[in-house]
Design a protein with these regions (language model features):
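NAD(P)+-binding Rossmann beta1-loop-alpha1 motif at the extreme N-terminus of oxidoreductases
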Residues: 1-55, 114-117
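Short amphipathic alpha-helical segments
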Residues: 2-3, 29-30, 65-68, 92-95, ...
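Short low-complexity, flexible loop/linker segments enriched in glycine and/or proline
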Residues: 33, 70, 121-124
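Rossmann-fold NAD(P) dinucleotide-binding segment
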Residues: 43-106
Length: 143
């Protein structure tokens, strides 16, 4: 996903990469064209420098912990896109928390069983039509 964002997205600034295992983030950076990404060492820095934050984590607890840390800073107006495959109740809980902090939340899980491709496209198209500024210059991060 990061490689596609960098190669096919219209990014004016480098993609910000964070991983709980720093080596994974630096390994990913090495696979992306030079100058197109930077690695940060903590969630707070990634979120503070970003307008759009993608998360893709292994389980419900990891997503909850990550977003709980992410919303501690100023997230007003930011867009969080979670691509993790987690329980719908967890997704609803996370959406509520993110929105209570003044940010926006889109669930875009990675498996068709949870949300089919047309459904994902519809969700994203709806979000972008309501918030066209997200299609313009933005700082993106992924973790």
């Amino acid at each position: 996903m990061c490689k596609n964002l960098v190669e096919k997205g219209n990014l004016d600034k480098p993609l910000i990469i964070f991983n709980r295992t720093t080596k994974r983030a630096t390994d990913l950076k090495e696979r992306i064209p030079s100058g197109k990404s930077i690695v940060v060492l903590n969630i707070e820095e990634a979120v503070s420098k970003s307008d759009i934050v993608f998360t893709c984590l292994g389980d419900d607890l990891a997503v909850k912990d990550t977003l709980a840390t992410a919303v501690k800073g100023d997230v007003k107006g930011k867009l969080f896109v979670d691509c993790s495959t987690i329980h719908p109740d967890t997704t609803n809980e996370l959406a509520k928390s993110v929105e209570e902090h003044g940010a926006h939340f889109v669930a875009c899980p990675g498996t068709p069983s949870t949300c089919s491709r047309p459904c994902k496209k519809l969700i994203l198209d709806q979000q972008y039509s309501e918030h066209p500024q997200w299609l313009r210059t933005a700082n993106w991060s992924a973790f």
